[in-house]
Amino acid sequence: MSRNQQLFEQSQKFIPGGVNSPVRAFKSVGGTPVFFRKGEGAYAWDADDKSYIDYVGSWGPLILGHAHPEVVDAVYAAAKNGLTFGAPTEAELEIAELLCRLVPSIEQVRLVSSGTEATMSAIRLARGYTARNRIIKFEGCYHGHDDALLVKAGSGALTFGHPSSAGVPVETASSTVVLDYNDLAGVEQAFNQFGAEIAAVIVEPVAGNMNLIAPQPGFLAGLRELCTRHGSVLIFDEVMTGFRVGLECAQGLYGIKPDLTTLGKVIGGGMPMAAFGGRREIMQCLAPVGAVYQAGTLSGNPVAVAAGLATLKLVQVPGFYDKLAARTRKLTEGLAAAAAKQGVVFCAEAVGGMFGLYFRESAPKSYAEVMSCDREAFNGFFHAMLEEGIYFAPSAFEAGFVSAAHGDAEISKTLATAEKIFARE
């Protein structure tokens, strides 16, 4: 029995399912999860001391790669001065000013500790600001495990949502309308029916939790126009895309300004930190100046802020995102070419430093199309690559990530390995 297997067996005695977040359990792909003990650059080492080229990167935060020296040094320096204060610090002002300068739509920002906190708080804030209750979200988009957002579509286009998790009250789910991603006509229909009740539309500007789905031309602009027309708050959930697809996030890439933005992952540099921010008029509704309550013991934690500041400093280097996008395209185009050479039905797509792999003829545009991918083919590919030391997301429905530490050697090895595996199909 391998050390990974031993650890997983033992973990299941003390941790539900043996993991602290469900996707880590390999339920989607089968087999034993990898227990990591060390990371450096583009590589991670498991409990059996096997190395992997890592394309998960802790699900997106590690845009510089594992254990970047400047980030580690910043964390160490901050920790020496105290792990937490529960009081304001100069560093949290520094990162707030930086986020307001870099993100086009953010005039004020509030720091929190997780993406779920950020989206939950943004929803509450939108409801408080508009004095409305109904929310629109999109099938397959994940916005954390807040009750109001753990909702799946009903049986008809405009039926109220149903809980997608046990423990979520039907009454809570019923205030959320779930629509098809990239279907602007469906959103317009919802506004025609519920417009005066809709507090907010929340959307991943690039969907990354049903594999990767890019917005179709006009979709985000259409959401902006509809929210403006009906007085609803447009929320871009950029927990994943923020500083991953560009220095101005997805909103800068596509030229659309939301009213509120949620951030996470990259802004914490690998530490637990997130944020939500937007128009000053809306943010001023937050306590202590407004009536919408939000708080957190570890919000603005100085060690997490230090990691975030170090990371955001490095991604501002000219050419950083051009190089990252080029590396990611080299990976996806190379994988698609390798599959085509062997006659394997497969395609791939990239946006900035994130990518999707699909065992289907063309890149999906909706949740329904994602569900039509050949999951068995993906699972076989995943395990074959894992055996060769290439770690992709252990699910056919998750995006992957390239970091600045992934160089030509890592990409070339990945492509050569994939071609060998495609040849077995």
Curated annotation (Swiss-Prot):
<dbReference type="InterPro" id="IPR004639">
    <property type="entry name" value="4pyrrol_synth_GluAld_NH2Trfase"/>
</dbReference>
<protein>
    <recommendedName>
        <fullName>Glutamate-1-semialdehyde 2,1-aminomutase</fullName>
        <ecNumber>5.4.3.8</ecNumber>
    </recommendedName>
</protein>
<dbReference type="InterPro" id="IPR015422">
    <property type="entry name" value="PyrdxlP-dep_Trfase_small"/>
</dbReference>
<dbReference type="GO" id="GO:0030170">
    <property type="term" value="F:pyridoxal phosphate binding"/>
</dbReference>
<comment type="similarity">
    <text>Belongs to the class-III pyridoxal-phosphate-dependent aminotransferase family. HemL subfamily.</text>
</comment>
<dbReference type="GO" id="GO:0042286">
    <property type="term" value="F:glutamate-1-semialdehyde 2,1-aminomutase activity"/>
</dbReference>
<dbReference type="InterPro" id="IPR049704">
    <property type="entry name" value="Aminotrans_3_PPA_site"/>
</dbReference>
<dbReference type="GO" id="GO:0008483">
    <property type="term" value="F:transaminase activity"/>
</dbReference>
<comment type="pathway">
    <text>Porphyrin-containing compound metabolism; protoporphyrin-IX biosynthesis; 5-aminolevulinate from L-glutamyl-tRNA(Glu): step 2/2.</text>
</comment>
<dbReference type="GO" id="GO:0005737">
    <property type="term" value="C:cytoplasm"/>
</dbReference>
<dbReference type="Pfam" id="PF00202">
    <property type="entry name" value="Aminotran_3"/>
</dbReference>
<keyword id="KW-0627">Porphyrin biosynthesis</keyword>
<dbReference type="InterPro" id="IPR015421">
    <property type="entry name" value="PyrdxlP-dep_Trfase_major"/>
</dbReference>
<dbReference type="InterPro" id="IPR005814">
    <property type="entry name" value="Aminotrans_3"/>
</dbReference>
<keyword id="KW-0663">Pyridoxal phosphate</keyword>
<feature type="modified residue" description="N6-(pyridoxal phosphate)lysine">
    <location>
        <position position="265"/>
    </location>
</feature>
<dbReference type="InterPro" id="IPR015424">
    <property type="entry name" value="PyrdxlP-dep_Trfase"/>
</dbReference>
<keyword id="KW-0413">Isomerase</keyword>
<comment type="subunit">
    <text>Homodimer.</text>
</comment>
<keyword id="KW-0963">Cytoplasm</keyword>
<dbReference type="GO" id="GO:0006782">
    <property type="term" value="P:protoporphyrinogen IX biosynthetic process"/>
</dbReference>
